[in-house]
From Swiss-Prot:
Biased composition annotated in UniProt, kind: Acidic residues: 191-201
GO cellular component: nucleus
Gene that encodes the chain: irx-1
Protein's name in the database: Putative iroquois-class homeodomain protein irx-1
UniProt keyword Ion transport, yes or no: no
Location of the DNA-binding region in this protein: 120-177
PANTHER family for this protein: IROQUOIS-CLASS HOMEODOMAIN PROTEIN IRX, MIRROR, ISOFORM C
GO biological process, one term: regulation of transcription by RNA polymerase II
Keywords carried by this UniProt record: DNA-binding, Homeobox, Nucleus
SUPFAM superfamilies referenced in this protein's UniProt entry, alphabetically: Homeodomain-like
Entry's family note: Belongs to the TALE/IRO homeobox family.
Domain of life from the UniProt record: Eukaryota
Amino acid sequence: MIPIANQVKMEEPTTPQTTTPAPPTSAPDALRGILPPNLLGQFHFHPAMAQVLAAQAQAAAAAQQATLAGFPGVPMFPHGIPADLKPEMLLGGGPGPMPMFFSDAHRLYHPYGLDGIKKRNATREATAPLKDWLHSHRKNPYPSKADKVMLAVGTGMTLTQVSTWFANARRRLKKENKMTWSPQNRRGDGCDDDEDDDDDDMNRPSSSTSINSERKGESLFGKPHLASPTPSGGSGGSDELTTPKKELVSPIPNDDSESPKRKPKMWSIADVTSDDDSSKKDSPPSSDENLLTGSLFQNAMKKQMEVMARLDPTLFRHTMHPFMFQLLAQQAAQGQQLALLAPQTTPPNEAGLNSQAETSTPSPASSPTSSPRSHQE
């Protein structure tokens, strides 16, 4: 007989077994058997070794950033290895030194304009406010500093660009003979630079090409010299061309030639003193005048020092520099030597007085002879 327990087990329905599907393989895993394992010339890390290296890199970056805390422009390093950056994809197979970048914006400047700041030329729309200002100030086209700042803000240009634009405009008007202002009618606030720019352009020497072009123009448009027959009646058929001889002009200017005088600038010490210097250069002082002025100056200084010494001798000794005493002693010795070497000449007034005294006073030889005669009489 079959036991009851076995019968019950046989009667129980069997449940169907469900199998779980395998996870889909990723692309690198799928290509692992096809591609070589060391494709980029790197070596593989064990997962545990990769984690240790990542922890070391993160700790080193944190320690370096902590030591540089408080300094401007602290370099920022990436903390560890990102999750999507596999260790085998790193250069050399490990984390290694990562490239650093700075947090300051001014350190991203590049001289070739890679930082987004590009130099651009001024357009007609940008210079329209400048033209309007120049049209409304024809009698005085010299903007002040406040006007330049206002125009620079309105046009998006710099102060240098605004000043250069106005200087070029004034030069262009001068060349076209459309100058409607007087050079003296200028504003005193920041207009000296503009006037200097104008003067530099006008006083700038012309280039060699322009001189050659002018000479060519003179030769082209000049009066042609016709051929004239020779006065001697030799051969009538042969005529010679007479060319006028040009006077050679020396490139070195003469002293008598009048050089164009430059307009003196306001508040210019050099221009104010230039006239005095030129007059002094015409008549150089002689050596006698120099000696006279030097002696007068020394005498005045000595008198002043004597007065100071009389007022307070102790203060004078303490405040006087020792080298000054030495200098005064040397000057006194030099004065004595000059006095001994100088020829002793009597002035004309003293000479005349001496001659008169000699004529008026009788000679000692004549006095004894005259006295006995008077007694005899």
